[in-house]
Swiss-Prot record:
Name recorded for this polypeptide: UPF0473 protein Clos_1662
Family of the protein in this entry: Belongs to the UPF0473 family.
Superkingdom to which the source organism belongs: Bacteria
Organism field: Alkaliphilus oremlandii (strain OhILAs)
Record InterPro entries: UPF0473 (IPR009711)
Length: 86
């Protein structure tokens, strides 16, 4: 199987691996975020937002956004970028 740079594998709540396509990374208020969509999903509306936290130059973690205001700001920035592309 060909490995693609825009596909990453994450573990779900049950410890099962799931592949995600990196739709976009964006910066909002000095923080970096990733918009991911499940590779095996047929629905266009399934997307997840994660905050990118760098451990060092080569390592990072994707963490869920707990703060509603932060999440809303990232979604608004993403939607604005998508509207501009259309």
């Amino acid at each position: 199987m060909e490995e693609r740079d825009d596909i990453i594998t994450l573990l779900d709540e049950e410890g099962k691996e799931q592949d995600f396509e990196v739709i976009m990374t964006l910066e909002v208020e000095g923080n970096e975020y990733a918009i991911l969509a499940p590779v095996d999903s047929d629905e266009d509306e399934d997307a997840y937002v994660f905050k990118i936290v760098y451990e060092n130059e080569d390592e990072y973690s994707l963490v869920t956004i707990e703060d509603d205001e932060e999440y809303d700001n990232v979604v608004a920035a993403y939607e604005t970028l998508m509207d501009e592309e259309m």
